[in-house]
């Protein structure tokens, strides 16, 4: 950049053209200014976040600098700024001085003004791009704490934050691609910050982020070095080879012909065939011709693995070409040739097509290029300009990375130690990269900028080191206190002692001051008179110093913040014998950490006694400190006589040991020893290390084994180190330990079986195993001898240390280097070899640094390979085995000695007993190694022979097929046999079904024999297969098989299973049953004594079975056992059996609606006598569409709730197959004792209670009174302004005198009215459609839970236990498990459920404590709470929780939205679904729960049962939920006739399924009323979203045209559809841009698609608060939980931020008032902060613990909202 500015300012002609171009551009901008400002207001929502970097910035505000650039009170004028040294350094190449930060800020301020005001004088000297670049670099070069003074800094930060929100969730490949193509420096900075942030937290995001960050920080987009220079270099080398090295080009022609072999090549091409075998033959011949067969086979694997990586980048080329052509604008070009030449030159140098702004510069330089000479001169000027642009792009890239790293150096961003360590490593990498650029001669003019960037990174590195030190355990210092009378020489002795402990000057701390900026951190610290001040808590200060935990010193200066105490030795002095009193609570901790030295000076004491009042002479002090008496006290001696009492009671009871007298030298030595002992730590030894090898021998053989290992190391030039004993020394490779059998060792052990001096001769034969007598594989031996730990680069070379070469490669081109490196690398590492080869060839003088960077990120293979590369810059020797060592020399050195010897283990390792000690992995490894060697020797010949066989097969006679089989399925036909398409399908299907491999001829022959009626086994099986293949695709039959093993229920398929046709399906056109028997797990076969089937029976539970009399008369058996205790009532009978079926069916006296196979039943259900073949039978006449047969008697007929109401007992025969005779269910008492306790007793008489027909109970459970909702202290006077109040409290409430009992009775009365719902046939057709629709994403046969406790733990433990047990579930839990009372209740219900018996369906009734609208409070309306029995809830959770979870997990794809989080991107999916509809209807329903038809609820439960397994638990749960609910309150039990209790298990899912079927039935009836037959699945032709009673219907035009009739049908079903806002009027389509669903308004906001919570719901959060239960709700609660209340108000602020700043300011005042009056420790967030937090939580960037991912409860902390 500095070269560009110098070029512009110093070259008059160029400057004149340049300024003219700028003026023209500015004039055009002024003409378009008005239009731009007008459009900016309307397009602000979609504006680029980096708009602050352009000419007219919408984010900019007015500046204090005048338009003419004159001075202000704090900023000098533009004329004065241009005279500063900083400005001169920016425009010159002087690199001796640093840039002044203050002057840099002033320059940036004027540049900002120049960007916003065209009148500023800077616009006449520099263009917009230069001004913007200077401003960006000014921000990067300043330290982070000084950037706030730069203009536009906050706008830049805001822009980067917006980019961060847009790109944070993008994958790594997308971000890296954006860095490569983006021209926006703010966007690039934000992307770098995202990459580096995720790299710091790679534990959460993946290790690939950290690896990619390290790699990309070392890379720079230098197109000139990467592409242009190698291209030019290759051209020069080729030209030199053709001219200088080969002066006679024609002499090269014979060599070229001999190399190409054109005649052989032509013959191969002539014989080529365009078939698979032809290509194999041709390619193999070409590989043989040029002798590249082996290397081609080795390379194919690498090419295939990299193929998919290239495909993934195919779209990048298209996007770049598109951006190139769409970014151009028209230019008036006088000479297009030179114009395009300049553009091509710019691309070759910078790697980028020049943008529109730089095209104007090119045009200005080429305006006078009208001749050849002037064109060449202009091109030279442009080349210099392009080189400067290339350097500028590097500086801008480095600036962006520096800003990103410096902004991550924040405790709120990088919070843990791991992230700080990774940030430190990344900062060091970038620092090293910038340092490399400072050494580049081309970048010398940018050294001031680069040095400032390095200074910024130095600050980051220092800060990270401080943060790491704070969190790291430190060495515990040694603290000695010199006590004694004043004047004895303690301070002087402390100084002398410090010099003996360390060569550094001691640090000095004064505890009388409260900050310690003067502390230097040296090894010794002296604190003189540490206890002189009573105001200082010196005891705790000393305890903090002598500690392993880091101690942060209190410092006043900003740069010293975070300074740690790091001294190793602490010397303190004191005049007190007891610095800390023993009675102090910190005395024990203090004296445990310090050692006290009692210092006395006998000469001084005698002088003071002899001559009191005279000064002490110097003769009393000696230089060697022999005048001092140093007495070291014992541990924890608080004075000379006593030791601290461990119990802290009597401190004068334990005598101190005698002191130890020392001199100054021995004291220093003692302190050093104490420091070493104090910091010794016991560390757990690692497990078996794979790099440690132990050779176990006898003690007498240790020296011999050591000599053998050293001989092996010298013979093989190995890298391991020989150690005697388990202790290891430093080694670059493995360590070989010579051990005795008794020594412990964590490594791999090998037993030495032979060991003598004569074995040294065996090494010449290279048989290491025979020499040592150990059993080792070749791989282990190679690993021992040649493994290299890490990557090592040796810049200095000793010839005796170089390994012997295995390969010598002369590098003439980049391909030579890459091809040789492949031997050293794994498959992943081979792709990085090409990059390294480019670096080596382009910059040969930087070979060690580049190879070091490359080696750090490269994975080397485990094979030992040594290669010597002879390059133009010198010789490089690379040795690899796990790791790598590299020697880079500037001259040619060839190591003599041939090929390195490969260690082998000998041929006897698997013979005899040696194999017994090898693990199987080693044996198989040897086998695979042997197979690999065999393959390597035959792979070429195998390929050649295969190709030769294919070539020979060309001349084999072939049969031709005719017709459509020709060239179609020829490979599948036999010799001379052609199949039609149908025959081909038959052949394939027959082989697949019968698991055969018949040829075509055998299949045709078998089919022919079967058609002729052959009776052999194969022909009979074929005819059976053919008949089953021709049957319908959906035929199957359920059968009961009775055998020796018992009774089995199996499904026998009568046809092959075929795919479902999703098109026209006639099964939806009319009602039909499912084809399977209801309650099949409860149905058994009744047989006679011979086992012949007579009829069926149905299990009622506990071994009681129901059947018909003519089936069980005589000797009847069930499951091979005679039945007993037979009781009859007419034709209906019951009996007992000890054989119990796995499930039971519920019975009920009522009218059936379904026959045993699910078909509808038409009957008047009036019993009368009918004449049958078995005599007169009293039964009911019915008609169905199912044909029955003899033996079907006893099968159940059911009602809408799945209860058995009658048994099949006869039919009309072949003449009238639809006529059926059904025996009604009659109660027969078969109970020996009560089966299960229940509240509702059928035997008790009915009573009337306040208009309800009910049963009286023995106990009375009253309805809870009072409320926990109170007025907030902040709104005692104005709570009436709120639209909601706590619900009515009963008869004593002045707002509504209605009693709680009356409220419950009024709420229950609608449940007692019968609601019919949709017609039977319509309902079951829609049920089939919904099942078919859900089958697309809900799996079948979801297993039920088999563990009772596991099912119980799936429940919400904050809810009621139901009518049989008082309190909530968590009240009956101990240590997370149920107590005995709850466990007994669960066990009794679970036992019945495992037998398939339905449980009592009873609920306890309460009233919900909540806020209600004031008008509803005055009317006395409260919502009921149905408390379900905990046993029923557990059984239902076990049966259907898996199905429910499968449905809710796919809410994005289906109509049911249970489980959706309206504060997440899921709301965007809802918005897209709504927008795609032709018409949208939002519907709510009044009194939804009480208007539900039992038949619809039973159909929904059957849907859940359809997707679950067929276990008894599922039968029990389904039968229980289908039975009528019973409400229990105030000592009465009411059996309701309709409705769906709100506390029913899985109520949200069942309600949603009901909703879907209601809407489907209404649509079906509306269409068929218009003579439109519905033969398709309705749910595939429209979309809907439902959550209980909330619904949004997205109708196509056809459905919308009959919407009035649809809603009319819903009303006819008993429902009460209303508008969402409860207003009166017909339901009409709404605007899809603002749809209300789940009390949320789904709309587009400036932040994206959001679900806005109702404003009144947010505001009433601040008026009421939860507290103790009371009737006085107008009085604030006595205690307030500040945590939950603070979280509630915080979330309310976040929700309010989505409604805009005006509404948020209103909420903010309420929040501040609540904080003040309620005493909360909460600071309400500002609008921008609340908006940022909500958006972060919405996008998943910032998680919160109170997030509720379900919309049936509010996402705020408190449940005050009306749901």
Swiss-Prot record:
Binding locations of ATP: 484-491
Single GO biological process annotation from the record: viral RNA genome replication
Organism of derivation: Feline calicivirus (strain Japanese F4)
Annotated phenotype, changing residue 1125 to A: No effect on protease activity in vitro
Gene3D superfamilies named in the record: 1.10.260.110, 1.20.960.20, 3.30.70.270, 6.10.140.320, 6.10.250.3230, P-loop containing nucleotide triphosphate hydrolases
O-(5'-phospho-RNA)-tyrosine found at: 984
Effect of residue 1079 to A: No effect on protease activity in vitro
The protein's name in its UniProt record: Genome polyprotein
């Amino acid at each position: 950049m500095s070269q560009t500015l110098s070029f512009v300012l110093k070259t008059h002609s160029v400057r004149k053209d340049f300024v003219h171009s700028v003026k023209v551009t500015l004039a055009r901008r002024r003409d378009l200014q008005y239009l731009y400002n007008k459009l900016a207001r309307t397009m602000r929502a979609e504006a680029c976040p980096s708009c602050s970097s352009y000419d007219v910035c919408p984010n900019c505000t007015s500046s204090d600098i005048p338009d003419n650039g004159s001075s202000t009170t704090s900023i000098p004028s533009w004329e004065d700024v241009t005279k500063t040294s900083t400005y001169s350094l920016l425009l010159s190449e002087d690199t001796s001085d640093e840039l002044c930060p203050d002057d840099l800020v002033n320059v940036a301020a004027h540049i900002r003004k120049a960007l916003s005001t065209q009148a500023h004088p800077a616009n006449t000297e520099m263009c917009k791009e230069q001004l913007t670049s200077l401003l960006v670099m000014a921000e990067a070069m300043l330290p982070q704490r000084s950037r706030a003074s730069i203009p536009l800094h906050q706008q830049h930060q805001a822009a980067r934050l917006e980019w961060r929100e847009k790109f944070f969730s993008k994958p790594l490949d997308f971000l890296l691609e954006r860095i490569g193509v983006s021209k926006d420096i703010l966007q690039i900075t934000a992307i770098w910050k995202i990459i580096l942030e995720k790299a710091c937290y790679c534990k959460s995001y993946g290790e690939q982020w950290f690896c990619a960050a390290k790699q990309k920080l070392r890379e720079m987009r230098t197109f000139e070095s990467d592409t242009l220079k190698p291209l030019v270099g290759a051209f020069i080398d080729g030209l030199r080879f053709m001219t200088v090295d080969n002066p006679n080009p024609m002499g090269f022609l014979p060599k070229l012909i001999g190399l190409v072999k054109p005649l052989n090549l032509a013959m191969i091409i002539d014989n080529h065939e365009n078939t698979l075998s032809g290509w194999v033959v041709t390619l193999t011949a070409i590989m043989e011709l040029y002798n590249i067969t082996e290397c081609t086979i080795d390379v194919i694997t690498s090419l295939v693995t990299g193929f998919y990586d290239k495909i993934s980048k195919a779209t990048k080329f298209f996007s770049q070409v598109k951006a190139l052509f769409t970014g151009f604008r028209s230019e008036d070009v006088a000479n297009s040739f030179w114009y395009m030449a300049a553009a091509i030159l710019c691309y070759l140098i910078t790697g980028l097509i020049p943008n529109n702004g730089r095209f104007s510069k090119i045009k200005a330089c080429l305006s006078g290029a009208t001749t050849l000479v002037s064109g060449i001169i202009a091109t030279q000027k442009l080349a210099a300009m392009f080189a400067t642009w290339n350097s500028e792009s590097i500086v801008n890239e480095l600036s962006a990375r520096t800003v990103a790293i410096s902004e991550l150096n924040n405790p709120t961003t990088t919070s843990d130690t791991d992230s700080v360590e990774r940030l430190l490593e990344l900062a060091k990498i970038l620092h090293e990269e910038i340092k490399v650029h400072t050494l580049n001669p081309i970048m010398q003019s940018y050294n001031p900028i680069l040095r400032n960037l390095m200074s910024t990174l130095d600050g980051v590195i220092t800060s990270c080191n401080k943060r790491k030190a704070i969190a790291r355990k430190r060495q515990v210092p040694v603290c000695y206190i010199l006590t004694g009378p004043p004047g004895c020489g303690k301070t002087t002795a402390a100084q002398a002692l410090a010099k003996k402990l360390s060569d550094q000057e001691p640090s000095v701390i004064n505890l009388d001051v409260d900050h310690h900026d003067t502390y230097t951190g040296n090894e010794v610290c002296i604190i003189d008179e540490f206890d002189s001040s009573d105001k200082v808590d010196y005891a705790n200060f000393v305890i903090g110093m002598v500690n392993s935990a880091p101690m942060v010193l209190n410092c006043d200066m900003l740069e010293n913040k975070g300074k740690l105490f790091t001294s190793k030795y602490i010397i303190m002095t004191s005049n007190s014998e007891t610095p800390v009193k023993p009675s102090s609570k910190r005395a024990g901790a203090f004296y445990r950490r310090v050692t006290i030295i009692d210092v006395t000076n006998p000469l001084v004491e005698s002088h003071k006694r002899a001559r009191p009042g005279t000064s002490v002479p110097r003769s009393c002090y000696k230089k060697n400190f022999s005048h001092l008496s140093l007495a070291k006290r014992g541990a924890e001696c608080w004075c000379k006589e006593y030791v601290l009492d461990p119990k802290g009671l009597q401190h004068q009871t334990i005598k101190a040991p005698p002191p130890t007298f020392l001199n100054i030298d021995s004291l220093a030595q003692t302190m050093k020893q104490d420091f070493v002992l104090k910091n010794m730590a016991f560390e757990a030894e690692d497990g078996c290390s794979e790099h440690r090898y132990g050779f176990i021998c006898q003690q007498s053989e240790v020296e011999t084994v050591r000599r053998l290992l050293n001989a092996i190391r010298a013979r093989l030039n190995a890298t391991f180190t020989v150690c005697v004993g388990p202790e290891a020394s430093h080694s670059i490779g493995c360590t070989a330990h010579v051990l005795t059998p008794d020594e412990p060792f964590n490594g791999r052990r090998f037993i030495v079986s032979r060991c003598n001096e004569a074995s040294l001769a065996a090494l010449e034969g290279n048989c290491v195993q025979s020499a040592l007598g150990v059993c080792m594989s070749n791989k282990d031996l190679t690993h021992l001898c040649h493994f290299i730990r890490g990557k090592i680069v040796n810049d200095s070379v000793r010839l005796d240390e170089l390994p012997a070469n295995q390969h010598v490669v002369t590098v003439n081109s980049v391909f030579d280097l890459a091809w040789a490196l492949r031997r050293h690398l794994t498959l992943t590492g081979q792709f990085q070899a090409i990059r390294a080869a480019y670096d080596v060839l382009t910059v040969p003088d930087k070979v060690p640094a580049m190879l070091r960077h490359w080696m750090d990120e490269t994975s080397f293979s485990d094979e030992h390979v040594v290669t010597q590369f002879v390059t133009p810059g010198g010789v490089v020797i690379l040795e690899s085995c796990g790791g790598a060592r590299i020697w880079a020399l500037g001259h040619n050195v060839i190591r003599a000695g041939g090929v390195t010897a490969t260690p082998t283990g000998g041929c006897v390792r698997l013979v005899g007993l040696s194999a017994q000690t090898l693990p199987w992995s080693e044996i198989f490894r040897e086998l695979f190694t042997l197979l690999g060697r065999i393959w390597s020797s035959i792979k070429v010949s195998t390929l050649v022979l295969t190709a030769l066989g294919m070539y020979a097969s060309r001349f084999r006679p072939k049969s031709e097929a005719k017709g459509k089989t020709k060239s179609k399925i020829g490979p599948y036909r036999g010799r001379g046999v052609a199949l039609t398409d149908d025959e081909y399908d038959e052949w394939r299907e027959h082989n697949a079904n019968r698991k055969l491999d018949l040829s075509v001829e055998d299949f045709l022959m078998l089919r022919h024999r079967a058609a002729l009626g052959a009776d052999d086994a194969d022909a009979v099986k074929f005819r059976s297969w053919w008949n089953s293949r021709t049957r319908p695709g959906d035929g199957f039959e359920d059968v009961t098989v009775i055998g020796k093993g018992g009774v089995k229920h199996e499904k026998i398929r009568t046809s092959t299973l075929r795919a479902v046709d999703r098109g026209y399906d006639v099964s939806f056109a009319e009602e039909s049953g499912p084809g399977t028997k209801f309650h099949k797990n409860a149905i058994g076969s009744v047989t006679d004594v011979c086992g012949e089937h007579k009829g069926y029976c149905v299990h009622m539970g506990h071994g009681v079975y129901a059947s018909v009399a003519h089936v069980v008369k005589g000797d009847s058996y069930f499951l091979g056992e005679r039945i007993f205790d037979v009781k009859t009532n007419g034709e209906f009978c019951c009996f007992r059996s000890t054989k119990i079926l796995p499930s039971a069916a519920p019975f009920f006296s009522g009218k059936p609606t379904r026959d045993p196979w699910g078909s509808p039943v038409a009957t008047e259900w009036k019993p009368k006598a009918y004449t049958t073949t078995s005599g007169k039978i009293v039964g009911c006449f019915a008609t169905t569409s199912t044909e029955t047969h003899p033996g079907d008697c006893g099968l159940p007929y059911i009602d809408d709730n799945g209860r058995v109401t009658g048994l099949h007992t006869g039919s009309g025969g072949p003449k009238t197959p639809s006529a059926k005779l059904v025996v009604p269910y009659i109660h027969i008492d078969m109970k020996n004792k009560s089966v299960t306790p229940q509240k509702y007793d059928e035997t008790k008489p009915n009573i009337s209670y306040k208009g309800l027909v009910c049963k009286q109970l023995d106990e009375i459970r009253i309805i809870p009174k009072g409320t926990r909702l109170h007025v907030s202290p902040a709104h005692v006077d104005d709570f009436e302004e709120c639209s909601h109040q706590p619900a009515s409290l009963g008869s004593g409430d002045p707002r509504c005198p209605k009693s709680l009992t009356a409220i419950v009775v009024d709420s229950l009365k609608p449940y007692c009215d019968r609601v019919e719902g949709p017609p039977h046939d319509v309902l079951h057709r829609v049920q089939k459609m919904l099942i078919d629709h859900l089958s697309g994403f809900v799996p079948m046969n979801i297993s039920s839970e088999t563990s009772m406790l596991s099912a119980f733990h799936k429940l919400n433990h904050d809810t009621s236990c139901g009518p049989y047990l008082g309190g909530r579930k968590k009240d009956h839990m101990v240590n997370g498990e149920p107590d005995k009372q709850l466990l007994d209740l669960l066990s009794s219900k679970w036992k019945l459920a495992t037998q398939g018996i339905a449980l009592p369906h009873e609920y306890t009734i309460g009233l919900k404590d909540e806020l209600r609208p004031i008008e509803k409070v005055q009317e006395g309306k409260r919502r009921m709470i149905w408390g379900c029995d905990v046993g029923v809830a557990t059984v239902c959770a076990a049966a259907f929780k898996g199905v429910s979870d499968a449905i809710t997990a796919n809410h994005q794809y289906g109509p049911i939205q249970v489980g959706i989080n309206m504060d997440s991107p899921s709301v965007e999916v809802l918005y897209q679904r709504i927008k795609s509809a032709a018409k949208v209807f939002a519907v709510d329903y009044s009194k939804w729960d009480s208007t539900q038809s039992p038949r619809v609820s039973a159909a929904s439960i059957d849907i859940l049962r359809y997707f679950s397994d067929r276990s008894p638990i599922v039968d029990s749960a389904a039968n229980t939920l289908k039975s009528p609910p019973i409400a229990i309150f105030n000592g009465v039990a009411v059996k309701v006739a309709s409705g769906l209790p709100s506390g029913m298990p899985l109520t949200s899912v069942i309600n949603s399924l009901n909703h879907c079927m209601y809407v489907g039935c209404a649509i079906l009836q509306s269409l068929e009323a218009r003579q439109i037959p519905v033969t398709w699945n309705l749910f595939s032709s429209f979309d809907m979203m439902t959550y209980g009673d909330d619904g949004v219907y997205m109708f196509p035009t056809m459905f919308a045209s009959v919407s009035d009739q649809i809603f009319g049908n819903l009303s006819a079903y008993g429902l009460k559809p209303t508008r969402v806002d409860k207003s009166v009027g017909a339901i009409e389509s709404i605007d899809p841009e603002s749809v209300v669903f789940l009390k949320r308004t789904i709309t587009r906001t400036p932040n994206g698609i959001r679900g806005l919570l109702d404003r009144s719901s947010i505001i009433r959060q601040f008026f009421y608060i939860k507290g103790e239960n009371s009737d006085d709700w107008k009085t604030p609660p006595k205690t307030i939980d500040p945590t939950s209340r603070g979280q509630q108000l915080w979330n309310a602020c976040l929700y309010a931020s989505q409604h805009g700043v005006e509404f948020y300011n209103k909420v903010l005042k309420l929040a501040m008032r609540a904080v003040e009056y309620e005493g909360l420790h909460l600071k309400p967030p500002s609008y921008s902060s609340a908006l940022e937090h909500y958006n972060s939580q919405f996008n998943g960037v910032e998680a919160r613990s109170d997030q509720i991912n379900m919309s049936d409860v509010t996402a705020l902390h408190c449940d005050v909202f009306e749901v």
